[in-house]
Amino acid sequence: MNPLPSRREVGIGRPVSELPLALADLHLSLSTNDRVACWLKPLPGPEWTTGRATDLVIGAGFTPAGSAIVERADVVLDMIRIHSLPDIVAAQMRLLIVGLNPSPYSADHSIGYARPGNRFWPAALAAGIVSADRNPRHALQHHGLGMTDLVRRTTQRADELNRAEFVSGFERVERLTAWLKPQAVCFVGLGGWRAVVDRKASSGVQDRTLGDRPVYVMPHTSGLNAHCRLEDLVAHFRAAAELADRA
């Protein structure tokens, strides 16, 4: 049984668009299964709703332990920190990267695609869409590259996830995209897109948008994906960046 939650105040007087990084900081400061009564206190406005608050804490790697409570313009959520990764996102992103779900290694290191054999960061560096290795904050702040996953539950293998999780996660990411409006969205791994949108989808620009933003889908960057070479992944990242710059 989880102990009574400690109280944390997050985002006091800040724009709602800054809450994802503030919640990411909270996630990093806690241990798995820590329980928190989180008071979200951003600047009030039409974009601030209980639904958005719930989406943001899920994206930050927490599980709500009850319904949101509204106190004036504040939203209070009792939540539990899970073994996962937080969204690293903000307004004015050039490209939003959407993965499937965190691996235990990535969750342990608090960095997406952290495993040495994963080719995400080498390919992103070679493509020029980032300039620091395995540093999501630097990628966001200096290159407008945001990172999220369809599902926040950490598993050894993606096939441990079910379609309902993909659908729920897809809906959350679509709301996130419609709100923050990145120039384009890049799905890393075809499995999630195929599970929800088009089971016959292939790599490249998709006909369907996400939150009214153009979408590029590319193969997974895992070193186990022997069908895709590093130079192929570099070309995919460059094509996704070009899509963003045309948007």
Named regions from a protein language model:
Residues M1-A37:
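An N-terminal amphipathic alpha-helical segment
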Residues I88-L100:
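Short, hydrophobic/glycine-enriched beta-strand segments
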Residues L145-R199:
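Internal catalytic-core helix/loop-beta-alpha segment
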Residues K41-L43, L100, F187-G192:
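Short, well-ordered beta-to-alpha junction loops that form the rim of enzyme active sites
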Residues S29-L30, V89, T177-L180, R208-G211:
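Short, conserved loop/helix-junction motifs that constitute active-site signature segments
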Residues P104-D108:
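Short N-terminal binding/cap micro-motifs at the start of the first secondary-structure element
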Residues P3, R7, S110-A164:
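Short, surface-exposed acidic-centric catalytic microdomains
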Residues N2-E9, W39-G51, A60-A68, R72-A90, ...:
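C-terminal capping/extension of enzyme domains
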